[in-house]
Amino acid sequence: MIESLLSVVGQRGVDALAFLLAFALTALMDSVFHDKLPHDHGREFAVNGALSKGKARGSGLIFVLCIALVSLAFLPFKVEYVIYTILLIASMLSGYFDDAAETAWNEYKKGIIDFAIAIVAGVTYLNFNGCGVNFLQWSFTLPYAVYLLLIVILIWTSINVVNCTDGVDGLSASVAVVTIGTYPVSYTHLTLPTICSV
């Protein structure tokens, strides 16, 4: 299916179609299942924490599942990509179950789950891509253990930074703006002043 789409609209068209489909599917599913999401119990120790009481939480469940479906449909089938998609869903589910729980999970439980996800992601990357690093005109190889440690630190820190920014709910708007802003720059030969004047 993707090959026939590529022959008709090209890679840019397939990328645009995947982007629009993910957006439309997420918007549709969010409007359909918004009332089914867990609701905030209020944050006892946060400034104005009571104001968040009752707002829907856990929209990452909808967001990530839609992204995963579109990714599996539009990306070439590779075991590596499937593993990353499963890890993305696992990371989302840990946050969702924490949001849905009557009493929030403690930091150690969330940290261990995130750490395990980071290790599996690091091992997956290194097993499929090796330990070589290419940066501009330089190329070098890192020892497996050092590279794995750096990957685990990066992923584990990234997951926790997302949690600190109110989860994927708080992060998704800024990511969407950056993605939408980057798309025309990535797929055209226009300079930024030309795009701004359009």
How does the language model describe each region?
Residues I2-L190, S197:
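"…together with the soluble PPM/PP2C metallo-phosphatase catalytic core" -> "…together
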